[in-house]
């Protein structure tokens, strides 16, 4: 049983030697948390726990100033930029804010400003109060009104160049509009994600078996820092502008007027911002925003106060890592203690098995919480995605008294265990190795946190997604049987597995499809004709249609070419699966599969796991009773294009794009989607665009569609 963390002694009671040891430990721990938060977008402690560590470190340094070093977390901002992005030097540092955790500390902040500016006790400086968006800080550089660079905060002095990704965010204007546009300026704000968009993204990630995000801040940061711009573009990121760095000609003299200017030039500015002229009004704003917090569409973790007059901001300047003229008034974490009554397993559309905590109902922030996400089996054991301990390494057991927090106001999370209240009867949780929905065995691939059901073709939880894949364009491509029809036919029990598609006609006298809304006799005849047209299919398309994990269009072709026909493929996979099931030793069939160029361990294991599930094999056998599978002709190695890399561009008149690709592959060529110096041939039709220019740039031969036909027919 894990020991309960000890309460540290008061800082006032520490000797210098004790303080030095604790200072070193705290600094290292905070630096580790900074790296996880700023670089990996995967924090393992709550904001409240992190703030407590910083407060402890600051208290030690206040009592023992000689322990302060240039590298202390109290003297630095964020974390160094991660590898993989170009570094950007900020013209004006992007520093973080000091924190206030009570009304008294806010009043002290205003008093410090008054003393520094030598103002009278009744001369209260105007304060701009704004919600503190919980997202990722971003700096945008504009030159002559045009966006030229975007960078993350990084360590405050050097950030990451994310320009290409930021151009996909609709809230970020590519060109500033209106008048008073400085020759050069750095405009700053926060990238964030709406709560509803975050929940939808996590559902998508969960269904795909990918890592889910802990909160909207992590999802926004992770989405912005993608190497693939297309992924960022697919994520619904938002942006609020609220600050600036370098600026050649400042268009206003107050913070409030600068925010109005930011709106004028095309940015979104938080509409809840208020100008306050007393401490009482500042605190009233804080309480009002706190009451609205749960109903806002986005996450906030406090309120920021800034001196309104910019000349006063300049006079006040900075201290260490933060400005004197601004402070963040943080919200207390919304937590409650309850009992973990059970752990339920949900199965996603792709077989990912996700544990969910069933809790004794408890109210947190005005919301009744009965369930909390547990992410995966490692999370239950007290291990984070990066392999590091979470919750002090304490595992979760049914019957535990747990502390639950509404992470980012959205998804409740179990943040700690009250270990002293653990029942003697509580046992370590055993994550199931079979699917609770269909009973198929569940596997966890090496290097992954997710365990998956292998009953791809027969698991009801996966059925709709698998059937949609089965009839997709690169698989059986059945016209008239789309997502809507698959969903409805499955809900009515008409199609449960692939073979059912091909028995619809004979079952129709009982089903009466023509009586279904949106269908008529003509529609039904057309659907049956489209199904019958797909009773003959190439082996590679069938393999792809099975929806085996890691087996995409390319790998399906590699497998089909290697085995040639369905009988040889089935026999080899059955032998490989049987050997794995019997004694765990690899068979000759597995070795042969694994040695196929381009396949490898991960794909080979996924294929064998599919065939090791007997109900998948039965579903495939039932399907083969209804269809004919054509053997795959071996690619030629003696054609004029064998071994060459070919790119098709523009409109093709004699081929569809898929037919052109297939013709090239039959001739032994490799088809690519982009032109590079490694490309041998570009086949260009009418309307060829950038790929034609790329071919000219790299000196690649360009031919017409007719010339291509002569080449492959000769």
From Swiss-Prot:
Q: State the UniProt keywords alphabetically.
A: DNA damage, DNA repair, DNA replication, Ligase, Magnesium, Manganese, Metal-binding, NAD, Zinc
Name the gene for this chain.
ligA
**GO CC terms, sorted:** cytosol
Q: Which Pfam families match?
A: BRCT, DNA_ligase_aden, DNA_ligase_OB, DNA_ligase_ZBD, HHH_2
Which parts of the sequence bind NAD(+)? 47-51, 96-97, 130, 153, 190, 306, 330
Q: Enumerate the NCBIfam families for this protein.
A: dnlj, PRK07956.1
Q: Tell whether Cell inner membrane is among the UniProt keywords.
A: no
This entry's Enzyme Commission designation comes to 6.5.1.2
> Which InterPro entries does the record match to this protein?
BRCT_dom, BRCT_dom_sf, DisA/LigA_HHH, DNA_ligase, DNA_ligase_AS, DNA_ligase_CS, DNAligase_adenylation, DNAligase_N
Cofactor(s) needed, names only, are: Mg(2+); Mn(2+)
Species assigned in the record: Nitrobacter hamburgensis (strain DSM 10229 / NCIMB 13809 / X14)
The record's comment on protein family reads: Belongs to the NAD-dependent DNA ligase family. LigA subfamily.
- This protein is called what? DNA ligase
Top EC category: ligase
